[in-house]
C-alpha cells in the first residue's frame, strides 16, 4: 500500500514546480507547475519516483481534473544544447509557472535553485516528497515525459528508449555507440558527443 502526503499541507494559491529529464541523454526536459485546490483532496500524492506507473497514470488524470490550475512545459533538445541543461531547466520551469491561468502567491520549486519568476519563489530540497503541490507537479512532468519516450521508441527503434527513458544505461550506451545519435539526442552531453565524433570519424575515413 502506498501512503501519500498529507493533503492538509496544501496552501491556498501556492504552486508546486518540478522537472523531469535533466539526466537523460535524449529528449526534452519537462516541467510542471500545479496549484492544488484545498477543497478537493487527492489521495496518494507522493514523489513520482516512489509510485508505480499505473498509480502515476491514475493520479495524472485526477490532478488534471481537480487542480485549480496546472501547466506542463518543456525545454527542447536544441535549447538544452545551446543553453546547458541547468539553464534550460530553469527556462522550462519559468514557462510552466507563466502558463498557469491563475497567478500563484508563491511558487515552491523542487531542488535548491529557483528560476527567475514574476511571483515570489522558494526552493525546497526534496520537495517532491514533502510538498503535495510539488509531488503533483512531479507526477504530471514524469507521466508526460515517459509517454513521449515510449512514442520515440517507435520512431527510433533499437535504442530501448521506451524502457530506460533516455537515461545512460548500459543498453542505451551500447546502442548509441553502435547506431549513433538520433535527432533527439543531446549533443552537449559527453556520451552523445563521443558517439557523434566517432561516427564523424568513420564517415571521414570512408570519403
Curated annotation (Swiss-Prot):
BP GO terms, sorted: DNA replication, removal of RNA primer; mismatch repair
Task: Supply the Gene3D superfamilies for this chain.
Answer: Ribonuclease H-like superfamily/Ribonuclease H
Which residues hold a divalent metal cation? 18-19, 110
Task: Provide the primary localization.
Answer: cytoplasm
Query: Ranges for the RNase H type-2 domain?
Result: 12-201
Cofactor(s) needed by this chain: Mn(2+); Mg(2+)
Q: Which UniProt keywords apply?
A: Cytoplasm, Endonuclease, Hydrolase, Manganese, Metal-binding, Nuclease
Q: Identify one Gene Ontology CC term for this UniProt entry.
A: cytoplasm
Co-factor note (free text): Manganese or magnesium. Binds 1 divalent metal ion per monomer in the absence of substrate. May bind a second metal ion after substrate binding.
Superkingdom of the source? Answer: Bacteria
- From the UniProt record, list the reaction(s) this protein catalyses: Endonucleolytic cleavage to 5'-phosphomonoester
Q: Kindly list the residue ranges recorded as spanning the membrane.
A: none
Q: What is its EC number?
A: 3.1.26.4
Localization, per the record, is: Cytoplasm
Q: Mention one GO molecular function.
A: manganese ion binding
Q: What class of enzyme is it?
A: hydrolase
Which family is this protein grouped under?
A: Belongs to the RNase HII family.
Role this protein plays: Endonuclease that specifically degrades the RNA of RNA-DNA hybrids.
What the entry lists under HAMAP family is as follows: RNase_HII_B
Identification of the protein by name: Ribonuclease HII
Gene (name only): rnhB
Amino acid at each position: 500500500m502506498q501512503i501519500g502526503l498529507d493533503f492538509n499541507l496544501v496552501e491556498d494559491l501556492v504552486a508546486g514546480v518540478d522537472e523531469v529529464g535533466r539526466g537523460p541523454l535524449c529528449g526534452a526536459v519537462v516541467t510542471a507547475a500545479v496549484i492544488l485546490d484545498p477543497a478537493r483532496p487527492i489521495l496518494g500524492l507522493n514523489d513520482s519516483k516512489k509510485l508505480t506507473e499505473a498509480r502515476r497514470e491514475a493520479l495524472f488524470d485526477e490532478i488534471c481534473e481537480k487542480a485549480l490550475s496546472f501547466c506542463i512545459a518543456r525545454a527542447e533538445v536544441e535549447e538544452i544544447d545551446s543553453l546547458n541543461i541547468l539553464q534550460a531547466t530553469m527556462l522550462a520551469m519559468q514557462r510552466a509557472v507563466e502558463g498557469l491561468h491563475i497567478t500563484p502567491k508563491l511558487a515552491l520549486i523542487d531542488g535548491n535553485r529557483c528560476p527567475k519568476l514574476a511571483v515570489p519563489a522558494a526552493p525546497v530540497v526534496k520537495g517532491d516528497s514533502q510538498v503535495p503541490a510539488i509531488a503533483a507537479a512531479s507526477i504530471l512532468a514524469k507521466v508526460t515525459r515517459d509517454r513521449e519516450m515510449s512514442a520515440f521508441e517507435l520512431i527510433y527503434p533499437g535504442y530501448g528508449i521506451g524502457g530506460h527513458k533516455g537515461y545512460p544505461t548500459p543498453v542505451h550506451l551500447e546502442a548509441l555507440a553502435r547506431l549513433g545519435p538520433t535527432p533527439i539526442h543531446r549533443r552537449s552531453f559527453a556520451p552523445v558527443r563521443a558517439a557523434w565524433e566517432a561516427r564523424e570519424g568513420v564517415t571521414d575515413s570512408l570519403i
